[in-house]
Regions:
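Extreme N-terminus nucleophile/cap motif
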Residues: 2-61, 75
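A basic- and aromatic-enriched beta-loop-alpha substructure that forms the phosphate/nucleotide-
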Residues: 59-80
């Protein structure tokens, strides 16, 4: 019998509803450390995607994207 298997975590943040904290992002990454992604809609109405295997870089990117786009775009954050 195998060990414990974690499912991916996906946070869906509708525009102008708040943000995921640094602490929560770090917890998501610690529990699902096999890669991370974030998607949002930019000022040109284009979907943007950022992927990373580096937790610190990813958390920093998520905080920036939420700050820059959270009031005008839905955001998806994924940890696998």
């Amino acid at each position: 019998m195998g060990g414990i298997s974690n499912m991916c975590i996906i946070a869906s943040i509708p525009k102008n509803t708040g943000t995921i904290t640094k602490n929560t992002l770090e917890t998501m990454c610690n529990n699902n450390s096999h890669g991370f992604g974030i998607a949002w809609i930019d000022e040109n109405n284009k979907i943007q995607i950022s992927k990373s295997m580096d937790q610190k870089q990813f958390v920093k990117k998520c905080l920036k994207v939420q700050n820059d786009y959270g009031k005008k775009s839905d955001i998806l954050i994924h940890a696998r």
